[in-house]
Swiss-Prot record:
GO biological process terms held by the UniProt record: cerebellar Purkinje cell layer development; hippocampus development; hypothalamus development; midbrain development; mitochondrial electron transport, ubiquinol to cytochrome c; pons development; pyramidal neuron development; subthalamus development
Keywords noted in UniProt: Acetylation, Electron transport, Membrane, Mitochondrion, Mitochondrion inner membrane, Phosphoprotein, Respiratory chain, Transmembrane, Transmembrane helix, Transport
Protein name per UniProt: Cytochrome b-c1 complex subunit 8
Residues where N6-succinyllysine is found: K33
Transmembrane parts of this sequence: 40-68
GO CC, alphabetical: mitochondrial inner membrane; mitochondrion; respiratory chain complex III
PTM sites of type Phosphoserine: S16
Its membrane topology: Single-pass membrane protein
Function statement: Component of the ubiquinol-cytochrome c oxidoreductase, a multisubunit transmembrane complex that is part of the mitochondrial electron transport chain which drives oxidative phosphorylation.
Domain of life: Eukaryota
Mitochondrial intermembrane-side positions: 69-82
Amino acid sequence: MGREFGNLTRIRHVISYSLSPFEQRAFPHYFSKGIPNVLRRTRERILRVAPPFVLFYLIYTWGNQEFAQSKRKNPAKYENDK
C-alpha cells in the first residue's frame, strides 16, 4: 500500500547515508577529552571574560545601594518640625 515511516518518498539523484542508532555512541570521549577541553578553554578565556562581569557586578551593586539610599528620608530635613 504505502511505504514504511522513514522511507515515505523516493527522491531521484539524492544519496543519503545514515548510521544505525545501535552503532552510535551517545557520549564518545566525554570524560577523557570533553571535560579537560572545557577546563582548558575556560583557563584560556577567563582573563578576557571575567573583568567585564566583575565591572558590571560592581556597577550593579553600587546602583542598587544608591537607589535604596535615595528612597530614604533625610532626618536632617525634619529636625525643626513640630
